[in-house]
Amino acid sequence: PIKKFIELHGLNRAKVAFKKTYPTDGNWKLTLDNFHECYHCLPAHPEYCHVHSKDYIQAYGAGNNTGPESIEFNKKLSLWNKKTEKLGYLTGEYSDSNFSNFFRSAERTPFDGDRLSETKDGKPGSILMGKFKEFDGGYTTVGTSPFNSFIMSNDFATIFTFIPRGPLKTDVEIMWLVHEDAEEGKDYDLNKLIWMWDKTTIADKKIIENNQKGVMSKKYVPGPLSEMEI
């Protein structure tokens, strides 16, 4: 069910532009919990919030379909779906049931305004990939398991792998993929490509490590993630 979302981006004709590992002093469960919820994004991740709309972030909440219903975002999504389908590109979403052993999910989501890519200025970060002949103003998110995620603009893909290294250590590995014919310095600027997720993951590393210190404390008392938490 998620294959068609990945095939849209032509990863079979991609190459690794950059790879970085973020060693994190935190349990794998804390690390994954942090990655899969977005209540902390607005106060903690200015770079991510610069790229992604507030309506989407609040609607995402602590994971797909856990946040409050966003009428404004649903309007944007409906209009974008119609426009994108006219271009002949895939839209929609998929999610395993809550009792699935796989935790698979996929969705296509619009950016705000005239943004085309997950770059700071919203302009293309590289040449188009896969089946795209022109930019559709959206991106694709795919989860193949709790430990692996793909976040793909039309022009580059960011692949996340979470690797437990011990009870209190987790490696967060990120690969940035571009079209196999793309040339660094000509078709893409590496710093522009990695900007958002590099900044965001460095901030997440600190958050996770602080959470781990709290969990290890005898005085730790868990609380809600947000006043919006349902």
Regions found by a protein language model. Name each.
Residues 1-230:
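C-terminal catalytic domain of Rieske-type non-heme iron oxygenases
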